[in-house]
A protein has these predicted regions:
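Polyanion-engaging groove/track-forming segments
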Residues: 1-641, 651, 655, 663, ...
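RecB-family 4Fe-4S metal-dependent nuclease core
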Residues: 567-920
Length: 920
């Protein structure tokens, strides 16, 4: 075998594929790692490929036991206690560097420096530790010792190596490699030092401002080389994604150099564990439900489909784990999977793990529980994946991950668990997936050019190497040297790497480097090898050719201007017909039709809705649902046990009962508040909620008001409305039906909001349409003549405040109606005007037109024109005829109909309607 050995040749080409020169059998080009493997094979010293995370785990276990008996103030006890995984990884890396330099884990002695004594103590106990295996450093040390033994003993051994050509000087190598190559020469291997190549014949620098500017220039230059049938090699030490886009655009294959990233599936592991940990992270659970596995272009949800779809609905109703909606979702999913026992078992197992056996981070996770939970995830990946798919690969990695976690003791901190998972799934560096090319080759490091001769195109020669770090203290270095361990100098290693790169570049004779001033907004540092190449020319009195990175005219192309049709957010024309009209509406639909009919049309007639995972309640919506349910459950219990003959009940303000119900429903309806970092918010919310709910019951009891029902469903006819089949049916749920002290039926609408004046203003301004809807339904049920005869009120569960115009509620302040521009003097007038406004919208839909006045009044240009600031005269954003029409429509909506203008700012689909978006 003929070996060409260079310090940076690991990964270099054995032959130069960009030339016509063919390689020969038994000729290889190697660096230190590859030569170590060859020698280990020839000397029968090969070891199975080691698993780095398992080695770290084994080292961590032994180090932990050693430090348990150490002085608690000694190095590195405190660091290990705070971050055991990182400390173990760093010490193992240091241990491997020592071993590769010849250290044999000498028995600790009194004169040994403390840090080395710790390493020696650990080294003695590694043999037999589960998960421990020798690493590359151990193999290198054994190769060094074995070759030295063969030299000393005079024994013959068939190495099968005839000659080694060293790209550099033997004296410059690290001590261990000087010994190894010297031993090989003593054993009969010819050793030759290759001569240093001469400086370059030509160096061209093409400079650009940014990578975006350099990409089309580089693509054009490479295209010119191909057109001229010139063989070349591209060096790309960073991603070529932008360059590849330009190459594909002009019809050339991509170079395929990309940053290595962990599989998106690997990111599911920490996501899954967060979702499985109580208190449950609902956002993590939503992410898990949104995760799919793609194999052979077929996408399957990670969580079984029948359960996934139902859990999405359950979480929209109750954003927590284990409540009634969750129970119903699991039961329905199992029923739907009755003919698929495998799917049913996965559903049962998932429900059991997350609801009945959740993980708990109580001073760390129980490692056995973590491994048990990961088994379900492993089965999902392996059952969905096939062959060499990414899915099956992730599944196969989970098995050793479970084994490793089990080796880390009984408990593991959440931080260390994340580190372990990252160690298994993380990647680094860059990878090349270039297509076959008879003229071009791609490498990621200048040294990988090896001994080839084709000219070079260097894409972004920037210095991104870390500065060499020496972790050995002077007293430790002195002790190691005295005991025969010659540590390599980090700076000397860096010089060897640079020299290897320079030799490979100089052999190519012709180099074109595409440089940029900034990368990712920061100044780009020039690669040191390029600096030396320029200095080579300077010493010869020459200069590199410097060109501006302007794209050649023949490679320039400008995009054709595209005309964008800006959607009209206010007025649209449609195919007229009854198909656009509803037959039944709720209050929310009614209000939407009045303020944003275009959005109602998108949602109710075109079926456009936000995805279920995007609408999981949070914030005030989540808390409001939780408190509503607390009130509902307490009322229903008392109705079942204590109702009067007329089916109503007076509920005492029992703080213990309220607090207990709040706590019981918390994980089902507001799991988000149980997460770390929310304790202050949770405490404040619990206190406010308890006080407000107790205040509600106290206020009603003091006024002699009894509760008749909560969440009472109703259906009534919207008399005089122009629906698809005549009068519309109006339906919904009333929050709380009450019987006043004088026997009159009334309604309370429960709210939870930080806007203290929102509903108070609605009552005073005569715009409380929701209360009017409730009043109409009660009046219909009890044959009351006027809506104003029905006492109605808002109760804010956050502020413990009742907003009403009816003094019979006993509120501290009874409000009076002072109609605003769009309000009504009483409930009956508001109802009639709202019906008039609704009919105007419905008649427009029937005729095939829709005018969204809500989108009109939220436009800044319209606001500036309609209500100009003092001293200004802005123009209308519309032509004169359109402005007149919109002004008339607004006047009619505000005075004759009902236009809930304050709610216009709340939009669901502004980008679709054109109310928002940059169309410039």
């Amino acid at each position: 075998m003929h070996i060409t050995f260079g310090w940076g040749f690991d990964g270099a080409r054995w032959v130069d594929p960009a030339t016509t020169t063919s390689g020969s059998l038994g000729t290889v080009t190697t660096g230190p790692h590859q030569l170590t493997d060859i020698l280990a094979t020839r000397l029968a010293l090969s070891a199975p490929e080691c698993d780095a995370p398992m080695r770290i785990a084994a080292y961590r276990s032994v180090l932990g036991r050693v430090l348990e008996t150490s002085d608690q103030h000694a190095w590195p006890v405190a660091s290990f206690r705070a971050d055991p995984w990182t400390v173990a990884r760093e010490l193992l890396s240091w241990r491997d560097r020592l071993v590769s330099a010849g250290w044999d884990g000498t028995v600790p002695t009194a004169d040994m420096p403390h840090r080395l004594r710790v390493l020696s103590t650990v080294e003695k106990r590694l043999d037999g530790e589960p998960g421990w295996s020798p690493g590359p450093a151990d193999v290198l040390r054994q190769v060094d010792l074995t070759l030295a033994h063969l030299v000393d003993s005079g024994d013959s051994w068939p190495l099968g190596i005839d000659r080694i050509d060293l790209d550099g000087q033997l004296a410059d190598l690290s001590p261990v490699w000087t010994r190894i190559l010297g031993s090989l020469r003593s054993l009969g291997v010819e050793l030759h030092e290759l001569p240093a190549p001469a400086p370059l014949d030509a160096l061209t620098l093409i400079t650009s401002d940014t990578v975006w500017d350099a990409a089309p220039v580089a693509a054009g230059h490479l295209a010119d080389l191909r057109d001229a049938s010139t063989r070349h090699t591209v060096i790309a030490g960073t991603s070529t994604s932008l360059l590849d886009r330009e190459r594909v655009r002009i019809g050339h294959p991509p170079l395929g150099v990309a940053s290595r990233q962990a599989s998106s599936y690997a990111q599911v592991i920490p996501l899954y564990l967060r979702a499985m940990t109580a208190p449950h992270d609902i956002h993590a659970l939503v992410g898990l439900l949104n995760t799919s596995i793609t194999v052979d272009e077929k996408t399957t949800p990670l969580v079984p489909g029948p359960l996934r779809s139902r859990l999405i609905g359950a979480l929209n109703e109750q954003p927590g784990v284990g409540g009634p909606a969750w129970d119903a979702a699991v039961s329905d999913a199992l029923a739907a999977s009755a003919d698929h026992p495998g799917t049913a078992q996965k559903i049962t197992d998932f429900d059991t793990l997350i609801r009945h056996r959740p993980l708990s981070d109580d001073n760390g996770f129980d490692t056995a529980d973590v491994a048990f939970h990961l088994e379900w995830l492993q089965r999902q990946f392996t059952s969905q994946g096939r062959g060499q798919s990414v899915s099956s690969d992730v599944g196969s990695r989970i098995a050793p991950l479970r084994e490793l976690i089990s080796l880390l003791g009984e408990r593991i901190s959440s931080r260390e668990l994340d580190q372990v998972i990252a160690e298994f799934t993380g990647t680094g560096g860059i990878s090349v997936q270039a297509g076959a090319d008879d003229l071009a080759d791609v490498v990621t490091d200048p040294a990988h050019l090896g001994t080839g001769s084709a000219q070079v195109v260097w894409w972004l020669p920037v210095d991104d190497a870390a500065a060499p770090r020496d972790t050995v203290r002077p007293d430790e270095l002195e002790w190691l040297t005295a005991n025969g361990v010659d540590l390599p100098d980090p700076e000397a290693d860096a010089r060897l790497t640079l020299d290897s790169q320079l030799r490979a570049l100089r052999r190519r004779r012709n180099v074109t480097a595409l440089t940029v001033d900034t990368i990712n907004g920061e100044s780009a540092s020039q690669h040191p090898a390029l600096t030396f190449l320029i200095d080579d020319l300077h010493r010869q009195g020459r200069e590199p050719v410097t060109l501006s990175g302007d794209l050649p005219e023949e490679h320039r192309s400008l995009p054709v201007p595209v005309s964008i049709d800006v959607p009209d957010p206010v007025s649209r024309s449609l195919t007229p017909g009854e198909h656009l009209l509803p037959t039944r509406i709720s209050f929310s639909q009614w209000e939407k039709l009045l303020v944003h009919p275009l959005e109602w049309l998108l949602e109710r007639r075109l079926g456009i809705r936000a995805g279920g995972l995007a609408t999981i309640p949070s914030g005030n919506q989540m808390i409001g649902t939780w408190l509503h349910t607390v009130v509902e459950n307490i009322v229903n219990r008392h109705l079942d046990a204590d109702a009067d003959t007329d089916g109503a009940v007076t509920i005492p303000a029992d703080h213990d009962e309220i607090a207990a119900e709040l706590r019981r429903l918390l994980p089902w309806y507001a799991a988000e508040l149980q997460m770390p970092g929310h304790s202050r918010e949770l405490g404040a919310t619990l206190a406010l909620a308890e006080q407000s709910i107790a205040g509600l019951f106290t206020t009603l009891a003091d006024a002699g008001i009894r509760i008749r029902a909560v969440e009472a469903s109703f259906t009534t006819t919207l008399a005089g409305s122009h629906g698809a089949e005549g009068d519309l049916e109006l339906g919904g749920l009333r929050d709380m039906d009450v019987i006043m002290a004088d026997g009159t039926p009334g309604v309370i609408d429960l709210k939870y909001t930080f806007a203290r004046k929102k509903y108070r203003d609605a009552v005073q301004d005569g715009t409380a349409l929701q209360l009017a809807v409730y009043a109409a339904s009660v009046a219909d049920e009890h044959s009351l003549r006027h809506l104003a005869d029905v006492p109605v009120a808002y109760f804010n569960l956050r502020d413990n405040r009742l907003d009403t115009t009816d003094e019979r509620f006993g509120a501290p302040e009874t409000l009076s109606v002072d109609p605003s521009e769009t309000g009504a003097s009483d409930t009956d007038e508001l109802w009639n005007r709202a019906v008039t406004g609704l009919n105007h919208i419905l008649d427009g839909l029937r005729a095939g037109r829709v005018t969204d006045l809500g989108n009109l009044v939220i436009q800044e240009d319209w606001q500036a024109w309609e209500k100009p600031k003092k001293g200004t005269s802005p123009a209308s954003p519309y032509d004169e005829d359109t402005t007149t029409r919109y002004t008339d429509d607004l006047r009619e909506a505000r005075t004759t109909g009902f236009f809930p203008e304050k709610n216009a700012v709340y939009t669901d689909y502004p980008l679709i309607t054109g109310a928002q978006g940059d169309f410039s």
